[in-house]
């Protein structure tokens, strides 16, 4: 624990020369509002918001370039509260600064329908750049924002001197001990150093207290040394009241352009709560009426009043609105001058901000003739990306060290990064479009979210479907935010073969489909893959993330695939030859991905027994379920109860479509190490097995 002598030193104020009494009053107002808000609702996290009051005030009122009247301003600095549990750290600044929150919003913290939920939520509260709460995600996504900022500079103003472009700005982060403990921040911080992201400035609130009290029980490392080892520019500031040290550290960080900056700020959580500061009780619970009253007495507030804000304090802090507009106007002059110099790049920016695709963008998408050589859908996806590359400069992405397997490299594209990281295989350029995440799947997921949130480019990242498990927290958060991230997940079943059960996805398709707002797209062949990419890129403005599920093994190019059908999520690929117009089939075979070919072959076997089968390709259940009832009933007539679903994964998500009388050809156990043909045969993924299931469904 921190000694009383250390607490005294850490809480000794150091203010710059232009700091006034009203600045101190504003900081104390933040502390009291945080204590009052949590006390009123009865739960929450007051301590960090209290001890970080000087830092938050300094960032929002004295450092960051932003305009409270336009929270979407292209030239703004971004702020990420990775320590999302301390949401009041952000909310109170948004209130004081005039971003759209009022005192009543602070009073309604964590209540139904309020603008101030327990953790900050993107799209919900003006001024919130990203949903945070699951620790580590914010810092990792901020790395993506910093990468996006550089890539966008390359698209729009590549030749400007550092700091001279209207597209230059900073990404500021506040991270906690918990953020630092999470593995995703280690992954992302390592990559940030590789990328030399000089526009990223992270404040680490080193208060050494968590829910279980003193973090020494679980965190003993020299975190600053760890970040130095990564290659970050590292500074240490003693004391959360040390505004002079905070501002000096910010200035130093801004001057370092070839490395991200890490500022370890030693604070005393809950200061100035006399009995609970520097304890776990200040972290995640209301302080209690007596302790809140004691805090108010210490800072000169009336202990019998709640939510006190002096009029002169609010007038002072709301002055940020005018200052922000002035900064915006100065920036606008620079932006307008750039627009006159760069009319073509300005047109590109306008198109991206309008979320439009260029005319003819999909005219050169590859097409494969039915019956041509079998092709893995991952290979088809790679061909599609290379065709799209010249038309869509906003499209960029890569892989978690599996580019050759995922086929995620756009042909001819340089790698993104400082030239110094170039290898024999890859030429890096500051503004390249091929991303190398390394074996950092979790960070990749969070970084993609940061890129998309920063806007306005489109980013994708690839790995094996099995390793989507490593990405799941970031994927869920992207779905919660309804942002348009793209995940390319290949090697999608036991069909990957010899790598064996550790790498063969079994439960993954159903597990991913369980995430609300995530679209899981598993095309049947090369053409469906092209149609899927077309649909994914045409979906914008909060359509939600998409996981594109692709095969390792070759699959035949099928007859009858349909672009509109793919966009609708499911469609009739083939009806039995003897079926008359308007006549319903005897049985419906529903399949996805590499198993659609089995349904087509089973249709022929069933026809030999005078059973008329319909084959439905269902690349995306989520898109299909969003269609009108009329369309869904036309594809899957309710009167046809004999149904079979075929997918090389667990059956869990298919019962809703096949019903109690239907059959599911699935795999409910882990695989083995063997070639894909052997595995499909031994585990019952054959045309004969599908036909037999159809006959059972007819008998049910």
From Swiss-Prot:
<dbReference type="InterPro" id="IPR009014">
    <property type="entry name" value="Transketo_C/PFOR_II"/>
</dbReference>
<feature type="binding site">
    <location>
        <begin position="133"/>
        <end position="135"/>
    </location>
    <ligand>
        <name>thiamine diphosphate</name>
    </ligand>
</feature>
<feature type="binding site">
    <location>
        <position position="552"/>
    </location>
    <ligand>
        <name>substrate</name>
    </ligand>
</feature>
<feature type="site" description="Important for catalytic activity">
    <location>
        <position position="283"/>
    </location>
</feature>
<feature type="binding site">
    <location>
        <position position="177"/>
    </location>
    <ligand>
        <name>Mg(2+)</name>
    </ligand>
</feature>
<dbReference type="InterPro" id="IPR005474">
    <property type="entry name" value="Transketolase_N"/>
</dbReference>
<comment type="similarity">
    <text>Belongs to the transketolase family.</text>
</comment>
<keyword id="KW-0808">Transferase</keyword>
<dbReference type="InterPro" id="IPR033247">
    <property type="entry name" value="Transketolase_fam"/>
</dbReference>
<dbReference type="GO" id="GO:0006098">
    <property type="term" value="P:pentose-phosphate shunt"/>
</dbReference>
<feature type="binding site">
    <location>
        <position position="178"/>
    </location>
    <ligand>
        <name>thiamine diphosphate</name>
    </ligand>
</feature>
<keyword id="KW-0460">Magnesium</keyword>
<keyword id="KW-0106">Calcium</keyword>
<feature type="binding site">
    <location>
        <position position="48"/>
    </location>
    <ligand>
        <name>thiamine diphosphate</name>
    </ligand>
</feature>
<feature type="binding site">
    <location>
        <position position="283"/>
    </location>
    <ligand>
        <name>substrate</name>
    </ligand>
</feature>
<feature type="active site" description="Proton donor">
    <location>
        <position position="441"/>
    </location>
</feature>
<comment type="subunit">
    <text>Homodimer.</text>
</comment>
<dbReference type="InterPro" id="IPR005475">
    <property type="entry name" value="Transketolase-like_Pyr-bd"/>
</dbReference>
<feature type="binding site">
    <location>
        <position position="499"/>
    </location>
    <ligand>
        <name>substrate</name>
    </ligand>
</feature>
<dbReference type="Pfam" id="PF02779">
    <property type="entry name" value="Transket_pyr"/>
</dbReference>
<feature type="binding site">
    <location>
        <position position="207"/>
    </location>
    <ligand>
        <name>Mg(2+)</name>
    </ligand>
</feature>
<feature type="binding site">
    <location>
        <position position="209"/>
    </location>
    <ligand>
        <name>Mg(2+)</name>
    </ligand>
</feature>
<dbReference type="InterPro" id="IPR029061">
    <property type="entry name" value="THDP-binding"/>
</dbReference>
<feature type="binding site">
    <location>
        <position position="491"/>
    </location>
    <ligand>
        <name>substrate</name>
    </ligand>
</feature>
<feature type="binding site">
    <location>
        <position position="283"/>
    </location>
    <ligand>
        <name>thiamine diphosphate</name>
    </ligand>
</feature>
<dbReference type="GO" id="GO:0005829">
    <property type="term" value="C:cytosol"/>
</dbReference>
<dbReference type="Pfam" id="PF22613">
    <property type="entry name" value="Transketolase_C_1"/>
</dbReference>
<protein>
    <recommendedName>
        <fullName>Transketolase</fullName>
        <ecNumber>2.2.1.1</ecNumber>
    </recommendedName>
</protein>
<comment type="function">
    <text>Catalyzes the transfer of a two-carbon ketol group from a ketose donor to an aldose acceptor, via a covalent intermediate with the cofactor thiamine pyrophosphate.</text>
</comment>
<feature type="binding site">
    <location>
        <position position="85"/>
    </location>
    <ligand>
        <name>thiamine diphosphate</name>
    </ligand>
</feature>
<feature type="binding site">
    <location>
        <position position="45"/>
    </location>
    <ligand>
        <name>substrate</name>
    </ligand>
</feature>
<dbReference type="GO" id="GO:0004802">
    <property type="term" value="F:transketolase activity"/>
</dbReference>
<dbReference type="InterPro" id="IPR005478">
    <property type="entry name" value="Transketolase_bac-like"/>
</dbReference>
<dbReference type="GO" id="GO:0000287">
    <property type="term" value="F:magnesium ion binding"/>
</dbReference>
<feature type="binding site">
    <location>
        <position position="405"/>
    </location>
    <ligand>
        <name>substrate</name>
    </ligand>
</feature>
<dbReference type="Pfam" id="PF00456">
    <property type="entry name" value="Transketolase_N"/>
</dbReference>
<feature type="binding site">
    <location>
        <position position="378"/>
    </location>
    <ligand>
        <name>substrate</name>
    </ligand>
</feature>
<dbReference type="InterPro" id="IPR055152">
    <property type="entry name" value="Transketolase-like_C_2"/>
</dbReference>
<keyword id="KW-0479">Metal-binding</keyword>
<feature type="binding site">
    <location>
        <position position="207"/>
    </location>
    <ligand>
        <name>thiamine diphosphate</name>
    </ligand>
</feature>
<feature type="binding site">
    <location>
        <position position="467"/>
    </location>
    <ligand>
        <name>thiamine diphosphate</name>
    </ligand>
</feature>
<keyword id="KW-0786">Thiamine pyrophosphate</keyword>
């Amino acid at each position: 624990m921190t000694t009383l002598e250390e607490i005294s030193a850490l809480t000794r104020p150091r203010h710059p020369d232009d700091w006034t009494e009203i600045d101190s009053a504003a900081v104390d107002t933040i502390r009291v509002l945080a204590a009052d808000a949590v006390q009123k609702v009865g739960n929450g996290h007051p301590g960090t918001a209290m001890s970080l009051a000087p830092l938050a005030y300094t960032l929002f009122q004295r450092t960051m370039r932003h305009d409270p009247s336009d929270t979407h301003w292209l030239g703004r600095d971004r702020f990420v509260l990775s320590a999302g549990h301390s949401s009041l750290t952000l909310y109170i600044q948004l209130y004081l600064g005039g971003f759209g929150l009022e005192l009543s919003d602070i009073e309604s913290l964590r209540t139904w329908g309020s603008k101030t939920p327990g953790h900050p939520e993107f799209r919900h509260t003006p001024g919130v750049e990203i949903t945070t709460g699951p620790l580590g995600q914010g810092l990792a996504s901020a790395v993506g924002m910093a990468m996006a900022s550089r890539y966008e500079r390359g698209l729009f103003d590549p030749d400007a001197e550092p700091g001279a472009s209207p597209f230059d700005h900073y990404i500021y982060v506040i991270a906690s001990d918990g953020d630092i403990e999470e593995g995703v921040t280690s992954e992302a911080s390592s990559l940030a150093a590789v990328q030399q992201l000089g526009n990223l400035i992270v404040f680490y609130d080193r208060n050494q207290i968590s829910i279980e009290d003193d973090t020494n029980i679980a965190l003993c490392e020299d975190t600053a040394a760890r970040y130095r080892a990564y290659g970050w520019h590292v500074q240490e500031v003693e004391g959360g009241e040390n505004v002079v040290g905070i501002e000096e550290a910010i200035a130093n960080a801004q001057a370092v352009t070839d490395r991200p900056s890490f500022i370890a700020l030693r604070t005393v959580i809950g200061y100035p709560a006399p009995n609970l500061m520097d304890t776990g009780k200040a972290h995640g619970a209301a302080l209690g009426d007596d302790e809140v009253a004691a805090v108010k007495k210490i800072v000169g507030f009336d202990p019998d009043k709640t939510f006190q804000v002096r009029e002169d304090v609010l007038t002072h802090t709301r002055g940020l609105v005018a200052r922000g507009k002035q900064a915006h106007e100065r920036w606008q002059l620079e932006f307008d001058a750039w627009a006159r110099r760069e009319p073509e790049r300005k047109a590109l920016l306008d198109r991206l901000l309008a979320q439009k695709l260029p005319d003819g963008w999909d005219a050169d998408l590859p097409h494969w003739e039915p019956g041509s050589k079998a092709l893995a859908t991952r290979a088809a996806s790679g061909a599609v990306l290379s065709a799209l590359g010249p038309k869509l400069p906003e499209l960029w992405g890569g892989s978690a060290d599996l580019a050759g397997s995922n086929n995620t490299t756009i042909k001819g594209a340089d790698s993104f990064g400082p030239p110094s990281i170039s290898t024999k295989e890859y030429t890096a350029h500051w503004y390249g479009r091929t991303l190398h995440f390394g074996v950092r799947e979790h960070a990749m997921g969070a970084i993609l979210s940061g890129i998309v949130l920063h806007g306005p480019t489109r980013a994708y990242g690839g790995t094996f479907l099995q390793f989507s498990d490593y990405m799941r927290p970031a994927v869920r958060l992207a779905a919660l935010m309804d942002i348009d991230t793209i995940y390319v997940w290949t090697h999608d079943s036991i069909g990957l073969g010899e790598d064996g059960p550790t790498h063969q996805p079994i439960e993954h398709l159903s597990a991913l489909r369980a995430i609300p707002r995530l679209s899981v797209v598993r095309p049947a062949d090369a053409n469906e893959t092209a149609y899927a990419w077309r649909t994914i890129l045409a979906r914008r403005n909060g359509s939600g993330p998409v996981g594109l599920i692709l095969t390792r093994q070759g699959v035949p190019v099928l007859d009858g695939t349909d672009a509109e059908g793919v966009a609708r999520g499911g469609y009739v690929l083939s009806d039995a030859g003897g079926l008359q117009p308007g006549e319903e089939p005897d049985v419906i075979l529903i399949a996805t991905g590499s198993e659609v070919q089995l349904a087509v072959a089973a249709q022929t076997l069933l026809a030999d027994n005078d059973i008329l089968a319909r084959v439905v390709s269902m690349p995306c259940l989520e898109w299909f379920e969003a269609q009108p009832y009329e369309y869904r009933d036309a594809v899957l007539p309710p009167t046809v109860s004999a149904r079979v679903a075929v997918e090389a994964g667990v059956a869990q998500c298919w019962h809703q479509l096949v019903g109690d009388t239907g059959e599911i050809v699935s795999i409910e156990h882990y695989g083995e190490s063997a070639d894909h043909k052997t595995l499909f045969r031994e585990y019952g993924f054959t045309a004969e097995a599908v036909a037999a299931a159809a006959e059972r469904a007819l008998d049910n």
